[in-house]
Swiss-Prot record:
UniProtKB keywords: PQQ biosynthesis, Transport
Protein name: Coenzyme PQQ synthesis protein B
Family under the similarity heading: Belongs to the PqqB family.
Cited SUPFAM superfamilies: Metallo-hydrolase/oxidoreductase (SSF56281)
Listed pathway(s): Cofactor biosynthesis; pyrroloquinoline quinone biosynthesis
Keyword Transport: yes
Amino acid sequence: MYIQVLGSAAGGGFPQWNCNCVNCKGYRDGTLKATARTQSSIALSDDGVHWILCNASPDIRAQLQAFAPMQPARALRDTGINAIVLLDSQIDHTTGLLSLREGCPHQVWCTDMVHQDLTTGFPLFNMLSHWNGGLQWNRIELEGSFVIDACPNLKFTPFPLRSAAPPYSPHRFDPHPGDNLGLMVEDTRTGGKLFYAPGLGQVDEKLLAMMHGADCLLVDGTLWEDDEMQRRGVGTRTGREMGHLAQNGPGGMLEVLDGFPRQRKVLIHINNTNPILDENSPERAEVLRRGVEVAFDGMSIEL
């Protein structure tokens, strides 16, 4: 299985266009050793030719331009994208669909709840229906697994995560299973397994068991501290309120990942306020000391 990190930042990217927090300002001033990042998205393939896009970020055009296999040039109009899987209906995971309209129709896999959001509060399916067949919905059931024809050796097993629907959603304060998903993706030829959960607010025993069965854990790296947005003066909500488990402290993501010495562990969906973006910070050093990697745009993983 080929895993390509197209974007590794949380919503807004890094540096965020309107932010002057210590990270964003430091990056622009050249006083912070850090790497710019686009908004979170990955691509998966079983042959390096046919790709499944997981989430479509607002930065999708630049992400595709930066990864040559996404333009195989086999025809006058072409793309390496053969299907799209949406893990939720967040704006920073779905807006990229608008930029892919020239390539419609697209096979889009998502849950009933995500499809409901994307036909009501943010009606992308409706909006793009006039573009050469638009978005063709394939339902993700919350039980069992599914296979996408373009990559027949990849088996996708979805699992619901405890997190909120987007602020625009008609059921923002009425959560349902299927609002947010993680994925276990297995290459049935190599046996390699990826646990992918860029929005992970809580970890229970069932999830821990799944994580133990994976070879690579690509998980939520949004915040270092739960109250980071408040500390930095750029927000009022905590990480838990937004559905993100912070890395630091008792019960934090790093403590969770300490229990997985065998697995490759990678943080993704990193917010612009997170001090681990500063490559010279003690927080970054602590992450690396504990055997955890920080995802970056263009990162490639094979399982």
